[in-house]
Every structure is written in C-alpha cells, then in structure tokens.
C-alpha cells in the first residue's frame, strides 16, 4: 500500500497504492484536471463553497497552491489512475489533531465515469489505513449532504457510522440543506478489516 514518499513544501507525503486507484501528492500539472470538473454543476452539487461557480482558473491555482503547501494539519491527495497517474479526483485528511487523534475527510471523485465502481470506497480504505496505522489517529469524521445518498452509502460501506443530522445547516444552490455527521473509530475499522 505505502510504496514511497514525496517531499512537499512543509512535509513528506506518502503515495498510497491500491488495486484500482492511486493516492498521490498534488502536482502543478493537476490544474487542468481540477478545472475539468469544477464548473460542472452535477460534480459540485454537494460540495462546499470552496467549489462554488463560476470557478475560475485563478480559483484553481489558489486551491492547488493550498494543496501543495501542505502542513501538519492537512494531507491532500489526488485520486489517480494506478497506471498513468492521471487525475481522477481528490481525497484529504484535514484538521488533523495529533492531540485528539482526529481528522476530517473530504472526497471528490470528479468524473461520472469513475463513480459507482468502488474507486471511492477503495480510496477511503487506503486513506483510513494510513490515518489509523501510520498517523495513529483514533477517529476520522466527515459531513455529507443528507440527500447525497450515493456518497452516504459509500461511507457506510467504508465503515463510517451516521452520528447525527444538522438540519438546514448549509446554503447551496438556492436552499438550505441538512448535513449528516459520520465517523469511524480506529477500533471499529480494525474489527471490520479483520472480518474482510
């Protein structure tokens, strides 16, 4: 799984290899991949205001600079083709707290052709293994729009448990949306891994 590391601006990023997906650090050459989906209303329908439209090349450059700058509180990976390393989307651990042993995960599988094939679930599995086994975290959490049933199912299959609903929490596309909080604990994840 962990095959090598790449030095970032302020930290070393691992490269995580799966059968059907590769998690690698961002590169400057990923900008066209980012820009290829960020103005697609279907791809961004359930994402935070970071990807509100119109999404300009400058927005993409700013996001890429943020991803490349790294830091001890975040690790941002590109989900890529395991052979060509072509950009498919992104997955991250953000707000990493070594003291609390927690982090938040964010996932975007950018193109429809890659969805529904288990790629997101495999990427989550790679990231969770790294978070729990290598970083020593004890809890990984996320939030997801309640109506995003495809993502919620993916997260449930990856071992996340729904912990609660914040009603009418986020404004997006002209209305307020309920947001579901989900999390997985290291012990729960380890038990699932043993049974797999």
Walk through the language-model features, giving the residues of each.
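A short, well-structured alpha-helix characteristic of acyl/acetyltransferase catalytic modules
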Residues: 2-61, 188-196
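Acetyl-CoA-dependent GNAT
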Residues: 54-113, 185-188
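Active-site acidic-Proline motif in GNAT/NAT acetyltransferases
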Residues: 111-113, 117, 133, 146-147
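Conserved acetyl-CoA-binding loop-helix of GNAT-fold acetyltransferases
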Residues: 116-130, 152-157
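Short glycine/proline-centered loop/turn elements that form peptide/ligand docking sites
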Residues: 120, 124, 147-151, 168-173
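Conserved GNAT acetyl-CoA-binding A-motif
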Residues: 133-143
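Conserved catalytic-core motifs of GNAT/GCN5-like acyltransferases
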Residues: 141-144, 161-181
